[in-house]
Amino acid sequence: MGPPRRVCRAGLLFVLLVALAAGDAGPRGEPPGEEGGRDGIGGARCETQNTGQMSAPGALVPFYVGMASMGVCIIAHVCQICQRLLAAGHA
């Protein structure tokens, strides 16, 4: 049972790395259009309101974590199938 445990550990590390990378992704600094309170057209003052929208990186973290965990499950199943096929071939 050594290889499946290694796959599980590697999978967990992969999921954690993806979650950390997705959380750190995205631009730094001020959001677009808020540089000094002026927009890019004519230099007019831009009034912004908080509409409760999440930033794209923050919204995508659950998606990336879910996709990574699904990938880990698929890899684990493929490893199990390959082990069974190899064991059946040697029997």
Swiss-Prot record:
The chain crosses the membrane at residues 56-76. InterPro entries: Herpes_UL49A (IPR017376), HSV_GN (IPR034707). The lineage of its organism: Viruses, Duplodnaviria, Heunggongvirae, Peploviricota, Herviviricetes. Envelope glycoprotein necessary for proper maturation of gM and modulation of its membrane fusion activity. Also plays a critical role in virion morphogenesis. Keywords: Disulfide bond, Host Golgi apparatus, Host membrane, Membrane, Signal, Transmembrane, Transmembrane helix, Viral envelope protein, Virion. It comes from the Viruses. It is found in: Virion membrane; Host membrane; Host Golgi apparatus, Host trans-Golgi network. It comes from Human herpesvirus 1 (strain 17) (HHV-1). GO terms for cellular component: host cell Golgi apparatus; host cell membrane; membrane; viral envelope; virion membrane. Residues 24-55 are virion surface. It is a single-pass type I membrane protein. Interacts (via N-terminus) with gM (via N-terminus). The gM-gN heterodimer forms the gCII complex. Residues 23-48 are annotated as: Disordered. The gene is gN. Belongs to the herpesviridae glycoprotein N family. This is Envelope glycoprotein N. Residues 77-91 are intravirion. Residues 1-23 form the signal peptide. Coiled coil: none annotated.
